[in-house]
Amino acid sequence: MAKAKFERTKPHVNIGTIGHVDHGKTSLTAAITMVLGKDNKDIKVKKYDEIDAAPEEKERGITISTAHVEYETKSRHYAHVDCPGHADYVKNMITGAAQMDGAILVVSAADGPMPQTREHILLAKQVGVPKMVVFLNKVDMVDDPDLLELVEMEVRELLSKYDFPGDEIPIIRGSALQALEGKPEGEKAIHELMDAVDSYIPQPIRETEKPFLMPIEDVFSISGRGTVVTGRIEAGKVKVGEAVEIVGIKATQTSTCTGVEMFRKLLDSGEAGDNVGILLRGIDREAVQRGQVLAKPGSITPHDEFEAEVYVLSKDEGGRHTPFTNNYRPQFYFRTTDVTGTIELPADKQMVMPGDNATFKVKLISPIAMQQGLKFSIREGGRTVGAGVVSKVIN
């Protein structure tokens, strides 16, 4: 089936619903499509059952169920992800299968914050979701206005505890069910929520506007011309004549881009998404290797120690059959290469079981160009046993 092409006249933002099981994430997702769909016939209205029966997808060998819906407001176009199960959220956020520029945290006014509310806020912080808006759902089930105030205070305190600005985050009260039933107060709350999302969730920086970065996949020597590195430009742009740094594994080197080639044609520049060969001035073939990155000078630094948020594959997903303990030494696969590293578990954690998610420190045997948010796989004998994201660079 041919996919309908979306008119890209409006800025695009990726968003998702997070929160505790049964607090109404999927109902809210359905309600948003329904309420916005009334004013805009291009929006596909999705029913609860269609969203809940999310198809399974594989991302880096991990099975994740995710529902994708799209809708638009007057000012933006949104791609929205909703996951049926808690484990799907954990996997989704860690692997970045569905990148989120912002989130809608759904909290049931009848229950207040619950364990998964906490875990999803923490995960959002660890994986670098920049901002979130709160939808206090099921307010039709709460008669006491003081109780609503109390729940709202509790949510704000929880957000602040995990370094989100709890005092300024918009909290919208409503009922997804009332919106689905077409009640005016229900629909009004959905419009309020989307206004808050439009204004509070920042416009993401496009890949082409970020500093230049290209993971090196291969290195060639061309007689009479010098050394050529190939790869796919991950971010930014590079022009002929610009200075670049070669970062990671060895000491950082500086060079100049003297040529950009794509499909055997010479170009003046390359940008995010292009598969290119870049000619480097004054660099020996032996001085560069796969696993390093080419970057705008000063934009990224090499590190061999970091803290990570990791999902460990279950046995059914082809992961380990047994838990691992402190000082476990697998391979960490960053961008294009494997680097051996040692894991240091937190003092209160004896082991990590297959199917778990955990936070721990890693010490690599050689430094890799990294910053918060970099994704990696954990491998053992060539098979993937985990997926992670750098939550904090240590040195």
UniProtKB/Swiss-Prot annotation:
Residues 10-205 form the tr-type G domain. HAMAP family: EF_Tu_B. Keywords: Cytoplasm, Elongation factor, GTP-binding, Hydrolase, Magnesium, Metal-binding, Nucleotide-binding, Protein biosynthesis. Residues 19-26 are annotated as: G1. It is an enzyme of class 3 (hydrolase). GO terms for cellular component: cytoplasm. Residues 61-65 are annotated as: G2. GTP hydrolase that promotes the GTP-dependent binding of aminoacyl-tRNA to the A-site of ribosomes during protein biosynthesis. It comes from Rickettsia bellii (strain OSU 85-389). SUPFAM superfamilies: EF-Tu/eEF-1alpha/eIF2-gamma C-terminal domain, P-loop containing nucleoside triphosphate hydrolases, Translation proteins. InterPro entries: EF-Tu_GTP-bd, EF-Tu_GTPase, EFTu-like_2, EFTU_2, G_TR_CS, P-loop_NTPase, Small_GTP-bd, T_Tr_GTP-bd_dom. Belongs to the TRAFAC class translation factor GTPase superfamily. Classic translation factor GTPase family. EF-Tu/EF-1A subfamily. This is Elongation factor Tu. Mg(2+) binds at T26.
